[in-house]
């Protein structure tokens, strides 16, 4: 038996940052198209909801609790967005340089990276890859203001809902998280090669079952 010890060196872990955003627009056939870099990404706020308990009573006592289905949502904030995202934001092109709004919104996938730091290695300790599937962006306001003596760039923001995808042996999910401090380096590289592309292959968004095959070495 061992006595509990708190705040040991190297175990004071924190998470911060957001970078390396990649957008994967979903085609009409349901397959994600090749990924494109999302520059200017400033924040992604994950907002799961649901799993609300409903108490059932019998024989004058609490009998059990049923929980509602859990859903995954998020808010994306950025200074800019890829041209490919316009179709996900309800825009369509009438011709080069001309777009119209209030059109059908395409679903998309998203990948981004956050830092996993600790008290010894700081921000160089590791990182997490966050994958989001079946996302759709809600309409959002865009606030333009006059240039003044305290200039600020417009920050775009989108609330996102998701439709989960199937995972063999588990409930469907709309999110996958990959921790570089725990996964084997070779398997992490194989996943990143798919996400970011290589000299020989386009960047793609692997589904959870494909990621599971890589992790299990199949």
Regions found by a protein language model. Give the residues of each.
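Membrane-targeting and insertion segments and their boundary/processing signals
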Residues: 43-50, 132
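Mixed-charge, glycine-accented linear interaction segment located at domain edges/termini
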Residues: 139-142, 146-218
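Structured, beta-strand-rich domain cores
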Residues: 62-140
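Polar/acidic, low-complexity leader/linker segments enriched in S/T/G and N/D
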Residues: 1-46
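Oligomerization/assembly interface segments of phage tail-like spikes and tubes
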Residues: 46-48, 56-57, 61-85, 150-165
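Surface-exposed loop/turn and secondary-structure junction residues enriched for glycine/proline
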Residues: 44-47, 88, 140, 181
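Ordered hydrophobic segments in well-structured contexts
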Residues: 15-25, 35, 109-113, 127-133, ...
